[in-house]
Design a protein with these regions (language model features):
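N-terminal secretory signal peptides that target proteins for export/translocation
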Residues: 1-3
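PEST-like low-complexity, intrinsically disordered acidic/proline/serine-rich tracts
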Residues: 20-309
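Bacterial N-terminal signal peptides
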Residues: 6-17
């Protein structure tokens, strides 16, 4: 087996007076910083809002207020619930409705729904989701570690591509001449994105995060990602899924983000979601996942004990 190791040294220089600059010293639009994609808006539009693609300003403020109130209510509760989690780690009440005020992250098709093929929907529903049982209400298998979700096994997640998770929504963008790197808080995912139009990896090289290539269209960064492996299911997709991301800096504290997903086996048509990335002044700390990960072993051991009854 051949292992290829790429080492990149990334140095960011911030001189006095340049902190608010929108361009890097080498002339690229500056997207650097720590950004959060947390939002209370669901991926797909709820049935109750089927004919309402946008919130009003007042409604958006109410959605944000209710999301925070729900978290505060849970913190105040003295009754332990199954699967409860220290609220100090959670961000579910800190999200904002996107700049467009859409009622779903899915922006196209216009109905706010992912356009699954029958095969794609069946695959998605049968796949161990990145989300846990607490989030989905569905019991995952426990015959082997591979039955559990990728995030639960400390491998990877889709937090950059989707947003709205209840924790680990911070992403640090670092730039160097010819490269842009996105380091995600959860599971230490680091996407090194060349910007020099180099050839893609061979089709036989497939990765959890795929193979990304980026370029600038005016002030917008466009990133195309292919070469995924078949060990993950991005909304039920196959390894042939193609993702196109667009990052547009709006002001010092805001980036508009749009993702377009194409996979003819899984979706009836390409579909897109929109979210807003907002600057955060905090730091991104280490996510210790494998360290002290007693949960996975305990789940499997509990399943074996149940089988012996």
């Amino acid at each position: 087996m051949r292992t290829t190791l790429h080492c990149f040294v990334l140095v960011t220089l911030v001189a006095p007076g340049l902190a608010g600059a929108q361009t890097t010293p080498w002339g690229d639009p500056d997207l650097q910083g720590i950004w959060s994609n947390q939002t209370p808006v669901p991926l797909e539009r709820p049935a109750a809002l089927a004919n309402k693609p946008y919130f009003t300003e007042t409604e958006a403020a109410e959605v944000e207020k209710n999301a925070l109130a729900s978290v505060l209510k849970n913190i105040a509760s003295e009754i332990a619930t199954s699967g409860e989690f220290n609220e100090i780690w959670l961000e579910s009440g800190k999200g904002r409705v996107g700049r467009s005020r859409r009622t779903s992250l899915v922006a196209d098709p216009p109905d706010g729904k992912i356009p699954f093929t029958p095969e794609g929907r069946a695959r998605w529903e049968a796949t161990p989701h990145l989300a846990t049982e607490r989030m989905t209400g569905k019991r995952l298998g426990a015959d082997r570690p591979e039955d559990r979700a990728l995030q639960e096994r400390c491998i990877t997640n889709d937090s950059m591509f989707i947003g709205g998770a209840f924790y680990n929504n911070y992403h640090q963008i670092v730039q160097a001449p010819g490269y842009l790197v996105i380091v995600s808080e959860s599971t230490h995912d680091a996407r090194v994105i060349p910007l020099d139009r180099r050839p893609r990896l061979g089709a036989n090289i497939q990765q959890y995060l795929g193979d990304s290539r980026g370029w600038w269209e005016g002030q917008t960064l466009v990133v195309e990602t292919t070469n995924f492996n078949d060990k993950r299911r991005f909304q039920g997709s196959t390894k042939d899924v193609r993702l196109i991301e667009r990052f547009s800096r709006i002001d010092a504290n805001t980036i508009d983000y749009r993702l377009t997903v194409t996979d003819a086996t899984t979706f009836l048509q390409p579909w897109s979601l929109e979210n807003t990335l907002r600057r955060r002044d905090e730091s991104v700390f280490e996510t210790a996942c494998h360290e002290g990960n007693y949960g996975l072993a305990s789940i499997l051991a509990g399943a074996r004990a149940t089988e012996k009854r």
